[in-house]
A protein has these predicted regions:
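Concave beta-strand-loop units of leucine-rich repeat
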Residues: 32-49, 59-70, 82-149, 153-214, ...
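N-terminal export/targeting and maturation segments
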Residues: 25-29
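C-terminal motif of bacterial Sec signal peptides marking the signal peptidase cleavage site
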Residues: 7-10
Length: 450
């Protein structure tokens, strides 16, 4: 009779007269379980007693609880245990009695402790529509931001009203844009992250030159995939009086092919380029110390790139750029073209002066190719060139030029009025803004937003 005794003590010694005992025979003893009615007052039961008896009350549909002896977390556990039961309770939050029918809750002026408790209970007030927090300064530590963020994640339908200042600027939790550019921050953006985690409508955050490093900015960005989070990166060599390069992470064009001013690009000083995920046009040519282009795999919108005259060999990052149509990859250490085979939009490809390249068969199925420049020094078997020409008869394949950009790669004719540009190269010059150089280079002093 031990189980029967536990259930009787846990769920009320007085069984309703209408309840009939259900006998469950056991080989050695008889156990009687009272399953109760559809509605029960369990306000005198402790959380442990409730956890014990609720699974046995199979007819229960509604139960009254005592919030004075129950935490919001424990209520959540009971709801998970019996999601089919409606739990009734009353809890005092900031001096106001709240229950499952409460629709509005005003926490204006409440202490941080009270707010933390209220946020926990608000998740279990199903009809709560509006939560008022008043106004204040985001930095005064009055709002428990982590708990509020948790509530907003659990109750995205809940309208939370709070007007606040952040670094001297005015916002609300419903703000869609936040411009904090050039405001020095000494906490690696921790306060901004805490606040913006509570702003579900945020779509634009500008933190250009705020002193927050790339890794912490990336954490803020990753927490808001629906928003455009922008900051400034630096790459290249700033030693020996060089300017280096600097761009905002939302740029669509980067021209950094002048190591004499920007410094030589290396794997170490180009890591930050991976945060420029909106780049369409990229020219990093003439950087002989650049032995990796791994950052390119984070540029899915890339359409044109010049990565010539580098010391890199792994072309696989370009496989993550499905929109790529123009690529100058001459004078590198490329030895395997297989990753390029999936680039169905690539039409103009320059592979001249690639002495480690001996196999172009991965290009056989790239029937969209219009121009392939191998030049006279890329050691590709003649039979492969012939086979590629047979498969793609409309492709211009050059195996004779001794200069990667000669032939008709850049110019199709010389006239009394100047050189006639090849259409693809003319497009490249336009999107890269070569005519505006040096003003089009990615030097910080060329950026009006710096």
């Amino acid at each position: 009779m031990l189980l029967a005794a536990a259930l009787l003590s846990g769920c009320g010694a007085a069984t309703p007269a209408s309840a009939q005992p259900v006998e469950t025979p056991e080989p050695s003893e008889e156990i009687v379980i009272y399953r109760g009615e559809a509605e029960m007052d369990l306000s005198d039961k402790s959380p442990d007693e409730l956890r014990q008896c609720l699974p046995e009350l199979s007819n229960l549909k509604e139960a009254k609880l005592n919030a004075d002896t129950l935490s919001a977390e424990e209520l959540g556990e009971l709801q998970a245990l019996r999601p089919d039961v409606r739990f009734l309770f009353q809890v005092t939050l900031n001096g106001k009695t709240c229950d499952p029918e409460t629709e509005k809750l005003d926490l204006t002026g409440a202490s941080r402790k009270t707010m933390r408790e209220a946020f926990a209970w608000a998740a279990y007030l199903p009809k709560l529509k509006s939560l008022e927090l008043g106004e204040g300064d985001a930095a005064d530590n009055s709002i428990p931001w982590a708990e509020l963020a948790k509530l907003r994640a659990e109750r995205p339908d809940l309208r939370v009203k709070y007007e606040f200042t952040l670094y001297g600027q005015e916002f609300s939790l419903d703000s869609e844009e936040m411009n904090l550019t050039h405001i020095p921050m000494d906490d690696q953006g921790a306060l901004v992250k805490a606040v913006t985690d509570c702003m579900p409508k945020l779509r634009y955050l500008d933190m250009d030159s705020c002193g927050v490093d790339d890794e912490h900015m990336a954490e803020i960005r990753d927490a808001h995939p629906e928003a455009n989070v922008v900051w400034r990166i630096w790459f290249g060599d700033t030693l020996e009086g060089r300017a280096g390069y600097s761009v905002r992470t939302d740029v669509d064009r980067i021209l950094a092919s002048n190591p004499g001013i920007g410094g030589e690009l290396t794997p170490e000083n180009t890591k930050s380029l991976k945060y420029c995920t909106k780049v369409k046009y990229l020219d990093l040519g003439h950087n002989s110390y650049m032995s990796s282009i791994d950052f390119v795999r984070y540029m899915p919108d890339l359409e044109a790139t010049v990565l010539a005259m580098g010391n890199w060999s792994d072309v696989s990052p370009l496989a993550s750029c499905p929109k790529l149509r123009y690529a100058e990859l001459q004078t590198t250490c490329i030895n395997d073209l297989r990753p390029l085979a999936r680039l169905k939009n690539l039409t103009d490809l320059n592979l001249c002066y690639n002495f480690a390249l001996h196999d172009i068969s991965p290009l056989y199925e790239m029937t969209q190719l219009k121009r392939l420049y191998l030049g006279m020094y890329t050691p590709v078997p003649a039979e492969q060139v012939a086979e590629l020409q047979r498969r793609i008869p409309g492709c211009e394949i050059n195996t004779t030029t001794d200069n990667p950009t000669d032939g008709q790669w850049r110019y199709t004719a010389v006239t009394p009025y100047g050189n006639e540009l090849a259409p693809a190269y003319e497009w490249l010059r336009e999107v890269m803004r070569y005519e505006e150089a040096p003003g089009s280079y990615a030097y910080s002093y060329n950026d009006p937003l710096y």
